[in-house]
From Swiss-Prot:
Protein name listed in UniProt: Glyceraldehyde-3-phosphate dehydrogenase
Keyword Oxidoreductase: yes
Protein origin, superkingdom: Eukaryota
Record text on subunit structure and interactions: Homotetramer.
GO biological process: glucose metabolic process; glycolytic process
Catalytic activity: D-glyceraldehyde 3-phosphate + phosphate + NAD(+) = (2R)-3-phospho-glyceroyl phosphate + NADH + H(+)
EC nos: 1.2.1.12
Species assigned in the record: Wickerhamomyces ciferrii (strain ATCC 14091 / BCRC 22168 / CBS 111 / JCM 3599 / NBRC 0793 / NRRL Y-1031 F-60-10) (Yeast)
Residues annotated as binding D-glyceraldehyde 3-phosphate: S150, C151, T152, T181, T210, G211, R233
UniProt family annotation: Belongs to the glyceraldehyde-3-phosphate dehydrogenase family.
UniProt-listed InterPro entries: GlycerAld/Erythrose_P_DH, GlycerAld_3-P_DH_AS, GlycerAld_3-P_DH_cat, GlycerAld_3-P_DH_NAD(P)-bd, Glyceraldehyde-3-P_DH_1, NAD(P)-bd_dom_sf
Gene: GPD
Pathway: Carbohydrate degradation; glycolysis; pyruvate from D-glyceraldehyde 3-phosphate: step 1/5
GO cellular component: cytosol; external encapsulating structure
């Protein structure tokens, strides 16, 4: 029996989540809410995508609905989630991809509006975080509001899990070289909390903070306090890369590290982790649905306990795929 789902926030992640969910027979998207996007505009934004290409099916709008491949999806424009009629539409699960309602108190509004469970597509300081392939098995049905963490944590955590399980991680530093996102500026503009973040996105490499590495400690508790990192925003439209430099607890050759990642990518983490020895660049991973693709040729071994590891990720599409995977997992446990 299909689960009924509503999407709050029809931005980059919300639209890609819809694309991916439409390919899953066990998911029925019945409603979308975005206060800034009317049905006609929603259909246009869903149909055309500058990064991932045009939607392959039929898209139109009819009254208060968008129509995708003949199926109507109701569009609401409520600013406050408590006013979205999830209950009336029979919505059991809400994916909140606004980046605004990311804490337990604000996401609770979806429950108050009639939904049963909420998956937040952003890291949260109060909602429990889950990363598919890392700790989703710790989910219990009493948890009504959960977070899918960030795209970078979804790339880093599976790699850290593999390395920590096999060799142990004493400590590490991460840099993510990250594509442009919607919060950045097309030209220099005001950004009071992050002055550098207000500079022209297309013409600069912009250092930024990220909690992605520290968040690994929330999904892998034994790594709490052992990882931290930063972000460098670069002028590419999509696909990012994690540079993880770690001090190991056990001696390892680079070949042993490669073998451990390859074994996981072909076994228990297949579909979540990838492995490549090709001479790849970022655009080779556009619309890749994996969380973390280990670049065996780009890493550096300095000594038996000190290595640099590189992993690619489509920060839009790979992450959105995991959102849907986590939703399905939660539904299977309820």
């Amino acid at each position: 029996m299909a689960i009924t789902v509503g999407i709050n926030g029809f931005g980059r992640i919300g639209r890609l989540v819809l694309r991916i969910a439409l390919s899953r027979k066990d998911i029925q998207i019945v409603a979308i809410n975005d206060p800034f996007i009317a049905p006609e505009y929603a259909s246009y934004m869903f149909k055309y995508d500058s990064t991932h290409g045009r939607y392959s099916g039929e898209v139109s709008h009819e009254g208060e609905n968008i129509v995708i491949d003949g199926k109507k999806i109701r569009v609401y424009q409520e600013r406050d989630p408590v006013n979205i009629p999830w209950g009336k539409d029979g919505v059991d699960y809400v994916i909140d991809s606004t980046g605004v309602f990311k804490e337990l108190d604000s996401a609770q509004k979806h429950i108050d509006a009639g939904a049963k469970k909420v998956v937040i597509t952003a890291p949260s300081s109060t909602a429990p975080m889950f990363v598919v392939g890392v700790n989703e098995d710790k989910y219990t049905p009493d948890l009504n509001i959960i977070s899918n963490a960030s795209c970078t944590t979804n790339c880093l955590a599976p790699l850290a899990k593999i390395i920590n399980n096999k060799f142990g991680i004493e400590e590490g530093l991460m840099t993510t070289v990250h594509s442009i996102t919607a919060t950045q500026k097309t030209v220099d503009g005001p950004s009071h909390k992050d002055w550098r973040g207000g500079r022209t996105a297309s013409g600069n490499i912009i250092p930024s903070s990220t909690g992605a590495a520290k968040a690994v400690g929330k999904v892998i508790p034994e790594l709490a306090g052992k990882l931290t990192g930063m972000s460098l925003r670069v002028p590419t439209v999509d696909v990012s890369v994690v540079d993880l430099t770690v001090k190991l607890l056990k001696d390892a050759t680079y070949d042993e590290i490669k073998a451990a990642v390859k074994e996981a990518a072909e076994g228990p983490l297949k579909g979540v982790v990838g492995y490549t020895e090709d001479q790849v660049v970022s655009s080779d991973f556009l619309t890749d649905n994996r969380s973390s693709i280990f670049d065996a040729e780009a890493g550096i071994w300095l000594s038996p306990r000190f290595v640099k590891l590189i992993a690619w990720y489509d920060n839009e599409y790979g992450y959105s795929t995991r959102v849907v995977d986590l939703l399905e997992y939660v539904a299977s446990k309820n």
